[in-house]
Structures are given as C-alpha cells and as structure tokens.
Amino acid sequence: MASLNQDQIKILEQSRQRLVQLTRSLASLIGSLNQSDPLPSWSSLQSQAGIISNNLVSISEHLADNKDLLSALVAYPGPSYPGRTQAPTLEQLLRTKLDPRVEDWVSRGRRAGASALEDRGALSESALAELWDWAPVEANQEARRRNWGGNFTLEEREMGIQNVVTGLRRQLEDEDEEASESEEEVEEEEMEVVGVRRRSGAGAGLEFDIAAPAPGSRQQQQQQKAAGPAVPLEDILRYMTTGIPPTQR
C-alpha cells in the first residue's frame, strides 16, 4: 500500500482518540466499583454506563464509515521502533487474529444479527400499526366486561360472591352494595369517558361512553392535591432510565 495521505492519517488519529476515550471510561467505571464502599449511587453508575454506551456507538459508526481504509491497512514496525523494550505492544499491533474471548463475542453477535434478519415470522409495520389500532379498543371492552376496578368480576357477581374462594381470612365486601347503602349528595362535576368502541355502519371512527364520576370524586381529587404536587410523566420516565430523582415543582 502506498504511503498514507493527511486525510487517512487523520482517520487513524480519530480512531485512536475514540479508543482512548472508551478505555478511560471503562477504567473509571471499574475503579469506582472496586474502590467505592459502599458502591456508587445508581445515578452515578447510570451516568457512567451512558458515557460508555455513547463511546461504543461513536467507535462503531467511525469504523463503519471508514471500513475500506481500515481493512486495507497493514501495520509493520519501522527501523527506529524499540522492538526489544516494547515487544508486548508490538505483538498486539502485529496480531492478525482476535483474542479467543473477543472472537467468541464477535461470532455470537454475528449469529444473533443473522437470525434477526432471517426472522420472517415477525410482524410487518402495517401489521403492527393494525395491532396497535385494535388493541386499545379491545382492552377497554374487556375491562368493561370484567369490571377490573372492584373486588369481584362480573362473572363472579353473576354466580354469587358468596361462592368465590379468595383464600383470604378477611371477608371482602361488594363495592356495589356499599354504594347503594351510603346516601351522598351528587355534586355537579365534569363528565368523563368510561368506555370506547368502534362505530358500526358506514361511518368510520369510535364511539365514547360518557358518564358522570362517582360521588365524592371531587373530594378525593382535592385530597390528592393537598397531599402534594403531581410529578410530571417526563420526570418519572427520566428517573426510570437515569436514576436521577425528579425535581419538585
């Protein structure tokens, strides 16, 4: 191969810098695990893992973009290289095969990738879209049929709640009977959606069942507001993925 030009040397230097960053990130994580007592916090470990993941993605993209050049390069020592004092480094540079452990990782990754590409039983994008369009309506209808919110399902009520074997020592009470016995004043409140189903006939779309909330729901909402501010969904998802506690608003 002819001598390298400046652009090719720049690509090699970028490869070296990315590998150095990955090595330092891994060394930092290993050091924190070995030296910290107790172990580092979850947010710290998650942050270090995120940095390592970003470094791996950067190296993978860089190697893929410059695959032709890197696969054609051949390393050999120059006359001025200290081969006697730097023999281990020279052996690593001149090595043509991967480490046995690394070679096993690579082969397993290639097999997993090939099997994923050959998996023709997976749903297509149109089938997935149709599934997501069908699932919410069916789940809502199933929930309405079974009345998941109470202690007993609709089928258990029809067969008699006294015949239901719960395995509990305490006696479960039917929520419908409690509601009929308690007399509370109905306040004017906003309507809410309690059911959804597909519209039959020529017109396409969905039909929604609207009903007033149960008595006392406004009081429950006021109690919830008094208990503390609600945490936004974005902060909850951020805490689940990064371990960083949500900020109080």
Curated annotation (Swiss-Prot):
Role description: Component of the Mediator complex, a coactivator involved in the regulated transcription of nearly all RNA polymerase II-dependent genes. Mediator functions as a bridge to convey information from gene-specific regulatory proteins to the basal RNA polymerase II transcription machinery. Mediator is recruited to promoters by direct interactions with regulatory proteins and serves as a scaffold for the assembly of a functional preinitiation complex with RNA polymerase II and the general transcription factors.
Protein name as annotated: Mediator of RNA polymerase II transcription subunit 8
Gene Ontology terms describing biological process: regulation of transcription by RNA polymerase II
Assembly and interaction partners: Component of the Mediator complex.
Localization per record: Nucleus
Annotated gene: med8
One GO cellular component term: core mediator complex
Extent of Acidic residues compositional bias: 173-192
Keyword vocabulary terms for this entry: Activator, Coiled coil, Nucleus, Transcription, Transcription regulation
The UniProt record lists the keyword Transcription regulation: yes
Family as reported in the entry's similarity comment: Belongs to the Mediator complex subunit 8 family.
Ranges where the record places region Disordered: 170-249
Coiled coil ranges: 154-200
Molecular function GO labels: RNA polymerase II cis-regulatory region sequence-specific DNA binding; transcription coregulator activity
Keyword match Nucleus: yes
PANTHER family assigned to the protein according to its UniProt record, in alphabetical order: MEDIATOR OF RNA POLYMERASE II TRANSCRIPTION SUBUNIT 8
Biased composition (Low complexity): 211-232
